[in-house]
């Protein structure tokens, strides 16, 4: 009887814990990289506007391949 309880107690614990844990880590990394790396990249571009002008097009291509990343970076760079 105790074995059945242990087995039935583990399965519900794993699925219940995995969805929330996956959601939280996913949300944090997405928002953090979107703000920090992008602002840094855009800041460095503002330091070298002449050199970054041609490179901006390449950066956009790289951002596009990433998907959601390009949206964040585009807003940051456009605001520049």
Swiss-Prot record:
GO biological process: keratinization
Keywords, in A-Z order: Keratinization
Domain of life: Eukaryota
A Pfam family hit: LCE6A
Stored InterPro entries: LCE6A (IPR031716)
Keyword Cell inner membrane: no
Ranges of compositional bias, category Polar residues: 1-10
Region (Disordered), start-end ranges: 1-21, 35-60
Family of this protein: Belongs to the LCE family.
Functional summary from the UniProt entry: Precursors of the cornified envelope of the stratum corneum.
More info: Belongs to the LCE cluster present on 1q21.
Designated name of the protein: Late cornified envelope protein 6A
Species per Swiss-Prot/TrEMBL record: Homo sapiens
């Amino acid at each position: 009887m105790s074995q059945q309880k242990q087995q039935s107690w583990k399965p519900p614990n794993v699925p219940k814990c995995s969805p929330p844990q996956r959601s939280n880590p996913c949300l944090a990394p997405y928002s953090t990289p979107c703000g920090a790396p992008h602002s840094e990249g855009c800041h460095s571009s503002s330091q070298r506007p002449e050199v970054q002008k041609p490179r901006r097009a390449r950066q956009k291509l790289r951002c596009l391949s990433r998907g959601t990343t390009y949206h964040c970076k585009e807003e940051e760079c456009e605001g520049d």
